[in-house]
Design a protein with these regions (language model features):
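Small-residue-rich segments of transmembrane alpha-helices in multi-pass membrane proteins
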Residues: 34-38, 73-84, 141-154, 186-189, ...
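Structural motif marking the loop-to-transmembrane transition
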Residues: 1-4, 8, 62, 66-70, ...
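Structural signature of hydrophobic alpha-helical transmembrane segments
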Residues: 1-3, 32-50, 106-118, 146-156, ...
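Selected transmembrane alpha-helices and immediately adjacent juxtamembrane segments
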Residues: 1-36, 126-180
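Transmembrane helix exit motif
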Residues: 53-59, 83-96, 109-137
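Residue-level signature of the transmembrane alpha-helical core
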Residues: 7, 11, 15, 46, ...
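Membrane-interface alpha-helices at helix entry/exit sites of multi-pass transporters
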Residues: 37-44, 66-71, 170-182
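Selective hydrophobic functional segments
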Residues: 43-101, 189-205
């Protein structure tokens, strides 16, 4: 039953965010965190995110502006690795407090507090009307890539920042979508490599 719920949620969220270009992590990661440890939830969300973007790559990948992809995705991939390593570090810290809820033992950890804060911030950004007008000068594209990649690696939340920094890059609508998809895949591959190595070393050895 749990697997059915997880698969259904992943399918529905992927469909809802297909055209927006962002929001999948904000919606899906908290749902996964109900069933898995937070770091595993972030990794599982990354797998769905990558699969979703590979599907979109087949549709719009050829329309991407690869000059912009390089400017955005190179710093994004580097900082995604750093963010993913930081996620692993936080996951290994000692719980700050313990309590019981509905007969189950629960803990308060630095990682949970950080992720909860970031979910709240990104949710507010994505829901606030002013966010629709939020855009940055094209010269800040590498900075946008770095920020998007870092928060993507740490929490899986990256799409809102990616869109805000690419929307004024002078791209046609199709090129914007294609560029966003290719950039997201680069980040996903970078962070999933770190998640895979750190998860294997921590849980399977």
């Amino acid at each position: 039953m749990v697997y059915l719920i997880i698969c259904t949620v992943a399918l529905v969220v992927s469909a809802l965010t297909l055209f927006s270009g962002f929001g999948l992590g904000t919606l899906l990661m908290p749902a996964f965190a109900v069933f898995f440890p937070v770091e595993v939830a972030v990794g599982a969300t990354a797998v769905v995110h990558l699969a979703n973007n590979i599907f979109k790559l087949a549709l719009v990948g050829k329309m991407a502006d690869y000059k912009v992809v390089v400017k955005f995705a190179v710093p994004a991939s580097i900082l995604a690795i750093i963010g993913a390593l930081l996620l692993n570090y936080f996951a290994g810290t000692t719980p700050l407090a313990e309590y019981g809820f509905l007969g189950k033992p629960c803990t308060v950890t630095i990682l949970k507090l950080v992720i909860a804060f970031l979910i709240a911030v990104f949710a507010i950004l994505e829901l606030h009307p002013r966010f629709e007008k939020l855009a940055f000068n094209p010269r800040y594209i590498p900075l946008g890539g770095a920020l998007s990649g870092f928060f993507g690696g740490l929490s899986g939340l990256q799409g809102a920042l990616r869109s805000a920094f690419l929307v004024r890059a002078g791209l046609a609508k199709e090129a914007f979508v294609g560029t966003s998809v290719v950039s997201a895949i680069v980040v996903d591959l970078s962070r999933l490599a770190v998640y895979g190595v750190t998860f294997y070393s921590k849980h399977l050895t």
